[in-house]
Amino acid sequence: MAPIGRYQPASRKNCKSAPRKLLLRAMTRSLLFVTGTRADFGKLEPLAAACRDAGFRVAFWVTGMHMQDRYGLTKIEVHRLPGVEVHEYLNQRPGDPQDAVLAKTVLGFSDFLAEHRPDLVIVHGDRVEALAASLVAATNYVRSAHVEGGEVSGTIDEVFRHCNTKLATHHFVSSKAAKARVMAMGEDAGAIHVIGSPELDVHGAPSGVTLAEVRARYAIPWDDYGIATFHPVTSEQATMGAQAAAFFGALQASGRHFVVILPNNDPGAEAIFQVIDRLPEDRFRRIPSMRFAHFSELMRNAAAVVGNSSTGVREAPWLGVPSLDIGTRQTNRATAPSVHYADAHEGERITAFLATEWGRRHPRHAGFGEGRAADRFVAVLRDEGFWDRPLQKAFRDLG
């Protein structure tokens, strides 16, 4: 593991299961995916696997929450992906402020690019790790692609997402609405590709595991359960403890059982952990992280999804699972008939949702695609016109 603030090589390549003919073709273009969390890896993995199978050389630069035991040491999941190189970088210590994490990540990724120069750097979303990689790629004149730009939310992270859009040379967005927002930021329509949300590719395919296997692996004792996730809102960190106490208090009062996926490491997380640690174990099963296929199977069979994760407003509607979005974290992110809304302190609304929606199933909502993002991503990268696009961008005025 590299020391904080300086990159040192720590790579592994596993090509045992990649077909020989694809490996011979893979000397053409090199792609580097940057991942800092379990969430963005769930979106990048199907894209990376499809690119590997199409003959591209694929590598991951792994940092952030992936490197921390408290959050499940999810770098292990990246290492499980065959046929790719994996490079690790420790970019933070517990309690580091976001600006320090950003600075350390810039230093580490800059050192990495001095030794490796991929043909394309791919980042996702709005995390500081993605922002650092986008900035370093831009200042080193390395082509970069931003996945799921043009989204809106209720947190300061939305600013980071829009920064990534301006730094990237190519954009792979989840919807026509997102494309319109990216164009409103002056980006060329020819560099924006609507592919849908990549994680739906996984949810649209068989998970490969049964619910019984998932429950056994993660020691989940109930077959009637909801999934609860409550992340910090960085601009509301002073109130996160009170919000978490009210939210989980309402869940506890319902008499239902819940699988609780632990929060990310944004500022305010410690107060949420303190609330979760006090929940009764006979009603709440706390899990730091899950393999994506196992989580997909768990969610398909859940009675409801509650909390402030994007899972509730994007993936749950696609699977037809009722969801309750709590607070401001996903404000204006998405709407669907199966998604309901409440403030963390609105116990009566939370109770009403659990009473009326628990166990219901809704028609699939395809506002973020049909589960074919990886195919569309590869099709764009196979077009030589993609690689001929100049790195120098021009601001495109609307109308």
Stretches with model-predicted labels:
Residues 30-35, 40-54, 89-189:
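Active-site and donor-binding regions of nucleotide-sugar-utilizing enzymes
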Residues 34, 67-70, 168-242:
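A nucleotide-sugar donor-handling region in carbohydrate enzymes
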Residues 56-101:
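Conserved nucleotide-sugar phosphate-binding/catalytic loop shared by glycosyltransferases and other
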Residues 67, 74-79, 209-301:
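Donor-nucleotide binding loops and adjacent catalytic segments primarily
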Residues 123-124, 131-134, 171, 291-335:
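A donor-sugar binding/catalytic signature common to diverse glycosyltransferases
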Residues 357-399:
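C-terminal amphipathic helix plus adjacent low-complexity
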